[in-house]
Amino acid sequence: MGFFSFIQEIAMDLGTANTIIISDDKIVVDEPSVVALDRRTDKMIAVGEKAKMMYEKTHDNIRTIRPLRDGVIADFTACEQMMRGLIKMVHTGSRLFSPSLRMVIGLPSSSTEVELRAVRDSAEHADGRDVYLIFEPMAAAIGIGIDVEAPEGNMIVDIGGGSTEIAVISLGGIVSNNSIRTAGDDLTADIQEYMSRQHNVKVSERMAERIKIHVGSALTDLGDEAPEDFIVHGPNRITALPMEVPVCYQEIAHCLDKTVAKIENAVLSALENTPPELYADIVKNGIWLSGGGALLRGLDKRLQDKINIPFHIAEDPLHSVAKGAGIALKNVDRFSFLMR
């Protein structure tokens, strides 16, 4: 990227929980999808990790917002500000002019025309000149290294923060898909509710997320891979006195069971709608898991035991969509039929 470069290409996975930006084949931004705004002026105070540090800790003059809910934009203005702030992180080095942006953005395959328009408008207001949109399961498949143009069926299950995208891909198109608004945020909410009900301890969204990372599991028996208990500190829900509660992975597996079952059922539903020839390919190739939810301990084994088809976790599940979007952007002519 030179001194007089007028066009910069960036690929973005605009996620409910995290936003990832790739430029020049490198991950240049990997930040929480959070923005902090001044209530009086609506000016941005912080974005990404800095804004997340303020989350649930602000006074009346600052509001912290997660602009996306269930994989789609819930607050248009905040999303535009967040995108601007995150894109600014990409502009490093000295240039005479701010470059025009050529962008491709990954979105849920269930997005309505209105939701697609909202993302495109946000990107254009954040200085995007050419804005392409690609559905997340297709981007994830490209990022994993699947030949999406091949005449064979591959199934992708992309579990993000706000939505789970399940798609059967063949010949460069999505043959059948199932998108549910049950994903990582629901697992976090389950843990918050469980800690309050079972242990009488109030935990924040951030603490529930830490519990999920340290002892989250889809199975009650992880064998040798079992994590150590996690100590949770928080106020008693009734007395407000400080508490210290050890939490084990087995109890978290029980509390996440219903949400994981919804994901299982969504995968089964997508398989039911898959043509027999493609179904045979999927049984042979296995099903690919991507997104942050793919990192939940034991999820691949639980799904495999339930569905009797091998499940593979992508090599870099958190970045599969962004990497695939980056490859699509570098090969726009080849992949133009995948983009909107």
Kindly give the residue locations of the regions a language model identified.
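Nucleotide/phosphate-binding catalytic cleft detector across ATP-hydrolyzing
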Residues: M1-I159, A167-I287, A294-R340
